[in-house]
UniProtKB/Swiss-Prot annotation:
It comes from the Eukaryota. The keyword Oxidoreductase applies. Aldo-keto reductase; part of the gene cluster that mediates the biosynthesis of an emodin derivative that may be involved in black Sigatoka disease of banana. The pathway begins with the synthesis of atrochrysone thioester by the polyketide synthase PKS8-1. The atrochrysone carboxyl ACP thioesterase MYCFIDRAFT_190111 then breaks the thioester bond and releases the atrochrysone carboxylic acid from PKS8-1. Pathway: Secondary metabolite biosynthesis. The active site is at residue 93. This is Aldo-keto reductase MYCFIDRAFT_87468. Its EC number is 1.1.1.-. Keywords: NADP, Oxidoreductase. It comes from Pseudocercospora fijiensis (strain CIRAD86) (Black leaf streak disease fungus). NADP(+) binds at residues 88, 210-211, 236, 265-275, 322-330. One of its GO terms (molecular function) is oxidoreductase activity. Substrate binds at residue 180.
Length: 362
């Protein structure tokens, strides 16, 4: 990726910059930055495009494709050096190991905390053994003597989970705390007041939410607004060329109310980065074929098409990477745009699907 080649500008009051002073360091920094930064919704906080997803960092006992510490640490350092300084994790990812690796990277490489934007999540159950995935048990886990009150969005659970995340990350605050899902078993007022109090005492700076039904998100926002409490500034939902159900309500609601969209699975678990196989459902395969066709005509990678499409519609997508060259590939989308005709071409075959990523309320 070629640098911007910015030269030190003259100063009307003090004249041209001395090429040996600190101004040149700023110019070098600008030229070495390959990332776009966008406002998170209507806030003043700017996040990197994309946001580095850290679900894949952790322990192979949790998921077999996890990047363990020896590979995860240099990946984080490489991402930071490229300017990808917004990292999204969760307390449940590898049962806390993802957060621990991030904390170790900050300490090992002496990364300035104020130059990072750290996002984590609460609400899920952190397993006491490496191979435990709390979401497998749905509501049943809350009846366990070992896990009662350890998840969900009660005031007690939220405070305990955030304190644990801060210890693992070895930091005093989270830039954005996200609730991982809606909790139908806790009053909304209790949840929103607890989240607001964390902002008030400085342990959290912004609040976000993840996949839920639009009416649930709207209720939570309305409760916060009614009581003068801190509202959510971001929504991390499921969105890609292969899954657009969020366009019905959630995306419209967020756009109208200034909530930033930071979707997960923007590349559909890699399906939008390579030609479709016969195992891919027919409807998805037809869309992927069109993405491939546009990419070939442009001389692009398929990921450029998928990311160009989604970058135009959100604050920043959340993407997990396993290698530095794949980060560089995503960053190469920076100056690429689809034409209106190309957008229509890759969109028009989409057909409605069943809702994904939102647990049933039972």
């Amino acid at each position: 990726m070629s640098p911007m080649a910015i030269e030190p500008a003259g100063d009307p009051e003090h004249g041209a910059f001395d090429r040996n002073d600190n101004a040149d360091a700023v110019v070098r920094s600008i030229n070495e930055t390959h990332v776009t930064y966008k406002r998170l919704g209507k806030t003043g906080l700017r996040v990197s495009v994309p946001i580095l997803g850290c679900m894949s960092l952790g322990d192979k006992h949790w998921v077999p494709w996890a990047l363990e510490e020896d590979k995860a640490l240099p990946l984080l350092k490489g991402a930071f050096d490229l300017g990808l300084n917004c990292w999204d994790t969760a307390n449940v990812y590898s049962n806390g190991k993802s957060e621990e690796i991030i904390g170790k990277a900050i300490k090992t490489y002496q990364l300035p905390r104020h130059k990072l934007v750290l996002l984590s999540k609460c609400g899920g159950y952190v397993g006491e053994a490496p191979n435990v995935k709390g979401d497998r048990y749905e509501n049943a886990i809350s009846r366990s003597k070992d896990y009662v009150n350890q998840g969900g969005l009660s005031r007690s659970a939220i405070f305990e989970q955030v304190e644990a995340s801060l210890r693992r990350l070895d930091t005093t605050y989270l830039d954005v705390l996200q609730i991982h899902r809606f909790d139908p078993n806790t009053p909304i007022e209790e949840t929103m007041k607890a989240l607001h109090d964390l902002v008030s005492i400085g342990k959290v700076r912004y609040l976000g939410a993840c996949s839920m039904y639009t009416y649930q998100f709207a209720q939570m926002q309305f409760v916060a607004e009614k009581n003068g409490w801190t509202k959510f500034v971001s929504m991390q939902n499921h969105y890609s060329l292969l899954y657009r159900e969020e366009e019905r309500d959630m995306i419209r609601f967020c756009n109208e109310t200034g909530v930033g969209l930071i979707p997960w699975a923007p590349l559909a678990s890699g399906m939008l980065t390579r030609p479709a196989t016969q195992k891919v459902p027919e409807g998805d395969r037809a869309i992927i074929n069109r993405v491939q066709e546009v990419a070939e005509k442009r001389g692009w990678r398929m990921s450029y098409v998928a990311l160009s499409w989604i970058n135009k519609r959100v604050s920043a997508p959340v993407i997990d990477f396993d290698r530095i060259d794949r980060i560089e590939e995503a960053l190469a989308t920076k100056d690429k745009e689809l034409t209106a005709e190309e957008e229509k071409y890759v969109e028009e075959l989409y057909k409605a699907k069943d809702v994904e990523g939102i647990p049933s309320q039972r």
